[in-house]
């Protein structure tokens, strides 16, 4: 089709156009559609897209993707959402197990709040699955407390771009909002750091701008990156932020440590998300029926046995994880308490860039390499 518009090639033989989007013209119900259907959506539903005449429109790639999505799904997409992917089997299983536990616990313990943990590695898609759980449970008010504020983008983007969450409201400290402007008829997702929302002001009270969070009875409180909070260290040490901006966003005055039992926020459900909740599990904080597990091995096993044409795991590469057993002599030094602290980022810190980069502790790094090569065995 483009060759009809641009039949003449450039002097170097290249095409005078570039294809930046290639989509299959099949609706979700299996029927086919033509470009005219996309043109109609661009003209009728996207008011900021200018029709230049014929098949030409002044628009962005995202505009076209959103229009195609509306044609495929048959769902109005005035918010210009560009994602419509579904749940993978393990995400559905995680949701089903959580729903079953929540319902069962509530029927037997009307005066208590159920807790559930998703112990799932990276690439599981915890944010998307958590939102789908909220939809299935019919939750309208969801509070996300994170122990690592850098994850906000993932929570915000899934809600803003996926067609399943059209009409949902997202707010955080970084978004410009007024609580009075909230539409109570639409689902609300509020995101913040646990230090900010649970921290106290200098007088020992709730921060003024967070009073509404404490006054709201949330349908669910989600603890993201829960393993950071499970260490029960001081708030500033717990957060080891990647940069000063993140630390500033995360900090809250007077929050000595996280203790959910004394949390001054009410909710009907708790959902915990973590890829490494080892301490929480080993301490007995969760029993087997309160946990859904998904490992890299589970992921790769699902990838190998997938039979359908489109494998949702195909883009997930195999990961090889190795562990190293420290020699007894080194363990003895650590257990005596003389040198019992270690910062991985500081140890491998480098100065310079590209070929001029060098380790700050080059001698120590070399000794570490010698160690894992068996130097202690000599």
Where are these regions (language model features)?
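Walker A/P-loop
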Residues: 106-133
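Short basic/glycine-enriched coil/helix segment immediately N-terminal to the Walker B
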Residues: 110-111, 183-186, 203-219
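Inter-Walker segment of RecA-like/P-loop motor cores
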Residues: 163-204
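SF2 helicase catalytic motif II
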Residues: 195-196, 211-271, 276
